[in-house]
């Protein structure tokens, strides 16, 4: 055991180096950095046989340890396992990989362990293009088990991982490429077939704000980032690490283009004086004959700020260099939470901004912490003093809309609503109505109960109401991606469902669903399509933002386009792509292993090359699956 500790010490001291070596542990000296994965009673301890895992509630409640593996390097991994509870049990040696905070999983090798007998699992593993790697032993239902002699042989990274050349993918001919794809183990998606919610899964996204522009709906979300404790366990979201805002858009509300994560705050942010970027909302206005787009956000709970762009996806600039709303703003000093902006531009071009939240002690029924102010013509200044909206049982999360001649102010209720005469429930979306954008407003009803009532995962409620192509929708957040990942820490994802506006102007209660919105129109594959457009995905990531956003696909990753209309048939497929180490692309119809439309080989060293290949002819409406081998960076694709 002493030899192992020395190796780990050397690796951490040689910052920036890559060192060959062998990690070995028989656990005679302790747990050696291993921890029990999962929540509940699962635990580990060292006994005379090795590392003992017990109290498991599920197969993935297992011993895990993070290893500084280097992308592109191959490792030999082995471990011995024994269980004494079942006649026979299947164990799995697996790896959890994260990229930009999003985890994915891969089973490496399986083995059946008879009761009371040691079994060895051994395999090789080529580390993909990921940020972190956790190796773990799972399976055997909830049986307790012991493992020993865990070994990893290969190159290890220091504290600062250096870039290394990945092993090149060389495909000599079409046959080799076909064999690679036919035998490929595809990565798993976190969005089931038939589910249009959540809107995306490649990152988290909370607190949705909306904007309609050029026949597209844009959704802006808080970019939740997974946080870990000192032992590598996922911990509750503190929101402290959030400094980016996601933006996606769609014309059919099923296939969404990911425009990337806008670097808003932090040292490298557009507003580098801000620490955080929460709860975005957006607006459009023509100023001096030019289209301008305004993105409002809060820097934690102490102010509202604004960015400006010439396109709804950016790039954005910081016009003020400081917050728009602060505690020095009149009538704002006593607002507990100076956050959660909601912007509204009326038909006459006048802009308004709502913000605020929190419940002062003893003021549950009438917190008085919401403010409403008119914006200046430039949308980056205010006119007059912010006024109070007396929203009953308010907690946070403002919204402002106009339907006909009625103005709707909506918000999230607090968590102490019991016994009120209005029928307000905890953590729900309520709404008020008025005949002026500055109020007064009267309470009108409850639109959406807490999402936990539908999905079993309770938490803060945050919403936007939007009219798109003649139908009103509720955009909100839920926690399906973290559930699919097997974690629980209030990491959220955006969803949509329809709103029914009754003849009298009241809003019918909305029911949250995973089915979501039906596709509004067939997808057009003949236009140049951003490669970051997808209905579902598995294992891909999006880097850059605005016109610099690109899709990165690793081995076995894929995206799905839903409902593409091939009314004009197909002759060729073109993709603009790059690959440092070589890659390949397969396009299949209707399922991951469906009829192959075409395949492309992308040689190592390709940079921004347009590849065109012949396709099978196809008619009618089909789903498209774009599957990646090796490593590919894709910009756009098009059918001719």
PLM features: what roles do these ranges have?
Residues 62-63, 86-97, 133-135, 582-589:
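Beta-strand acidic-aromatic groove motif in beta-rich domains, primarily in extracellular
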Residues 165-599, 606-640:
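Carbohydrate-active catalytic/glycan-binding domains of CAZyme proteins
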Residues 27, 91, 122-154, 615-637:
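Extracellular beta-strand ligand-recognition surfaces/modules
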Residues 15-21:
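Sec-dependent signal peptide cleavage junction
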Residues 4-14:
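Sec-dependent N-terminal signal peptides
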Residues 25-27, 61-89, 119-127, 149-150, ...:
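Extra-cytoplasmic beta-strand recognition segments
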């Amino acid at each position: 055991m002493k030899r192992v500790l020395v190796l780990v010490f050397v690796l951490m001291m040689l910052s920036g180096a890559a060192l060959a070596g062998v990690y070995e542990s028989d656990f005679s000296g302790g747990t050696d950095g291993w921890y029990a994965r999962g929540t509940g009673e699962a635990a580990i301890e060292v006994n005379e046989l090795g590392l003992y895992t017990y109290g498991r509630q599920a197969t993935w409640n297992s011993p895990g340890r993070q290893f500084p593996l280097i992308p592109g390097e191959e490792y030999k991994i082995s471990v011995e396992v024994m269980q004494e509870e079942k006649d026979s049990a299947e164990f799995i040696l697996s790896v959890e990989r994260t990229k930009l905070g999003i985890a994915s999983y891969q089973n490496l090798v399986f083995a059946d362990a008879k009761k009371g007998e040691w079994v060895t699992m051994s395999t090789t593993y080529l580390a993909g293009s990921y940020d972190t790697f956790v190796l773990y032993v799972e399976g055997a239902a909830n049986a307790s088990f012991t493992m020993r002699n865990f070994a990893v042989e290969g190159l290890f990274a220091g504290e600062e991982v250096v870039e290394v050349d990945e092993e090149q993918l060389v495909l000599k001919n079409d046959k080799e490429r076909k064999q690679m794809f036919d035998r490929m183990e595809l990565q798993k998606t976190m969005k089931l077939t038939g589910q249009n919610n959540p809107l995306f899964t490649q990152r988290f996204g909370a607190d949705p704000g909306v904007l309609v522009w050029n026949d597209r709906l844009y959704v802006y979300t808080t970019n939740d980032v997974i946080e870990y404790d000192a032992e590598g366990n996922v911990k509750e979201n503190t929101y402290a690490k959030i400094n980016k805002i996601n933006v996606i858009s769609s014309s059919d509300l099923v296939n969404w283009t990911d425009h990337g994560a806008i670097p808003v705050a932090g040292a490298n942010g557009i507003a580098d004086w801000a620490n955080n970027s929460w709860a975005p909302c957006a607006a459009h206005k023509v100023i001096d004959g030019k289209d301008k787009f305004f993105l409002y956000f809060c820097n934690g709970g102490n102010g509202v700020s604004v960015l400006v762009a010439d396109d709804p996806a950016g790039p954005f600039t910081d016009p003020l260099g400081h917050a728009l709303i602060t505690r020095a703003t009149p009538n704002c000093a006593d607002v507990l939470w100076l956050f959660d902006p909601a912007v509204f531009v009326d038909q006459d071009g006048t802009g308004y901004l709502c913000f605020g939240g929190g419940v002062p002690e003893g003021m549950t029924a009438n917190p008085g912490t919401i403010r409403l102010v008119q914006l200046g013509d430039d949308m980056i200044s205010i006119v007059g003093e912010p006024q109070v909206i007396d929203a009953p049982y308010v907690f946070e999360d403002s919204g402002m809309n106009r339907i006909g001649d009625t103005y709707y102010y909506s918000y999230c209720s607090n968590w102490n609503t019991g016994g009120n005469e209005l029928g307000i429930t905890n953590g729900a979306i309520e709404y008020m109505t008025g005949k002026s954008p500055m109020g007064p407003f009267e309470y009108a009803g409850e639109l959406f109960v807490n999402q936990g009532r539908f999905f079993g995962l309770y938490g803060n409620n945050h919403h936007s109401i939007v009219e798109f192509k003649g139908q009103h929708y509720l955009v909100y957040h839920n926690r399906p991606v973290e559930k699919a990942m097997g974690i629980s820490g209030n990491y959220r994802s955006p969803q949509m469902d329809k709103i029914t506006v009754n003849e009298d102007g009241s809003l019918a209660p909305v029911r949250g669903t995973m089915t979501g919105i039906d596709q509004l129109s067939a997808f057009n594959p003949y236009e140049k399509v951003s490669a970051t457009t997808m209905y579902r995905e598995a294992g891909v990531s999006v880097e850059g933002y605005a016109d610099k956003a690109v899709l990165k696909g690793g081995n076995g990753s894929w995206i799905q386009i839903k409902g593409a209309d091939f009314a004009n048939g197909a002759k060729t497929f073109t993709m603009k792509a790059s690959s440092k180490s070589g890659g390949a692309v397969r396009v299949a119809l209707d399922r991951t292993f469906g009829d192959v439309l075409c395949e492309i080989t992308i040689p190592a060293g390709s940079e921004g090359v347009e590849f065109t290949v012949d396709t099978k002819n196809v008619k009618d409406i089909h789903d498209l699956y774009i599957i990646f081998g090796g490593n590919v960076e894709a910009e756009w694709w098009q059918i001719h």
